[in-house]
């Protein structure tokens, strides 16, 4: 379900037998949570009249997933099924994470008449004006800006906006762990993924950054994991982190500017605020280095293929 949602952009549902089936979902649901994947988790529960009596393989399913979903709710009456289901789905979409609906087994066989609740879809939010202005100033004056694109770029449909930013600044674009789809790999400015089994070219390039725009990423530890003997995270760079979830800004790395907002909206806001000469400092030198670094890494990979 996680892979389907991430590859298609369509929200999916996961359901399993109560007890052992549900416990088998623990790690996959937490993975989807950290991947910002909106999912509907349906957990059948023991029937109301036997709940809490220690029936065969009964577990506390709400407590089990408490720290693994952005929202959870148990259906208290069959007549509220549509209402609760609608709310849980919307919470998953708004939180960009799994949300859980817990349904007692005796409700699965009831036939009732319900009024379908209206779907209220909230607009994704833009970044705060002060933070956007500061981010644009840093990027406009940067000598070696680097973009690190993550899941939020994919979820927010911000790939084109990321390309525009990169091309305006002639900045290399590194991708977060498991998010190679956040920037076209055939683009001249694409440096490849960081972190575990990542691109040495991406690591070498981001190590030179004086400003990093972490766009739509929580800066997953696996995305900043040292590789090939390179501790590449730029310790003296200004870090601009953009995430739809404010709790994840500054969670793993120190940030200079935190922007709570949708990656696409924020990218457009920054583009509008960049100075007319943004990216001009050492532009050609930077472009040449990107090309040389990528070429050297590709040659190394080619030699490995033939060993």
Model-derived segments and spans:
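Phosphate/diphosphate-binding loops
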Residues: 195-249, 253
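Phosphate/pyrophosphate-binding active-site segments
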Residues: 79, 102, 114, 137, ...
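Short internal beta-strands
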Residues: 41-43, 102, 170-177, 240-243
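Anionic-ligand anchoring segments at beta-strand to alpha-helix junctions in alpha/beta enzyme folds, i.e.
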Residues: 2, 15, 127, 134-212
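Conformationally flexible catalytic loops at phosphate/diphosphate-handling active centers
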Residues: 87, 91-141, 294, 298
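Conserved thiamine diphosphate
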Residues: 10, 56-95, 208-209, 257, ...
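Gly-rich Lys/Arg/Thr-decorated short loops/hinges at beta-loop-alpha junctions or inter-strand turns
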Residues: 42, 64-70, 109-122, 184-185, ...
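Thiamine diphosphate
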Residues: 1-48, 199-220
């Amino acid at each position: 379900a996680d892979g389907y949602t991430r590859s298609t952009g369509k929200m999916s549902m996961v359901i399993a037998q109560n007890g052992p089936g549900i416990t088998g979902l623990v790690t996959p649901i937490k993975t989807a949570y950290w991947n910002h994947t909106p999912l509907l988790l349906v957990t059948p529960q023991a029937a109301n009249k036997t709940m809490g009596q220690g029936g065969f393989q009964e577990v506390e399913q709400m407590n089990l997933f408490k720290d693994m979903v952005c929202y959870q709710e148990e259906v208290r009456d069959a007549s509220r099924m549509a209402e609760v289901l609608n709310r849980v789905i919307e919470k998953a979409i708004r939180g960009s994470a799994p949300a859980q609906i817990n349904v007692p087994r005796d409700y699965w066989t009831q036939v009732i008449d319900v009024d379908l609740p209206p779907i209220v879809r909230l607009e994704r939010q833009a970044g705060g004006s002060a933070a956007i202005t500061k981010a644009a100033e840093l990027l406009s004056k940067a000598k070696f800006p680097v973009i690190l694109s993550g899941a939020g770029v994919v979820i927010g449909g911000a790939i084109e906006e990321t390309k525009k930013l990169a091309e305006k600044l002639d900045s290399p674009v590194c991708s977060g762990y498991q998010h190679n789809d956040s920037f076209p790999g055939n683009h001249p400015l694409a440096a490849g993924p960081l972190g575990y089994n990542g691109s040495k070219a991406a690591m070498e390039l981001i190590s030179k950054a004086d400003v990093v725009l972490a766009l739509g990423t929580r800066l997953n530890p696996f995305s900043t994991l040292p590789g090939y003997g390179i501790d590449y995270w730029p310790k003296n760079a200004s870090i601009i982190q953009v995430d739809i979830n404010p709790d994840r800004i500054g969670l793993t790395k120190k940030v200079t500017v935190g922007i709570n907002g949708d990656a696409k909206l924020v990218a457009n806001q920054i583009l509008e605020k960049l100075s007319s000469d943004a990216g001009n400092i050492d532009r050609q030198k930077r472009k040449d280095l990107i090309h040389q670094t990528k070429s050297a890494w590709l040659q190394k990979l080619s030699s490995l293929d033939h060993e």
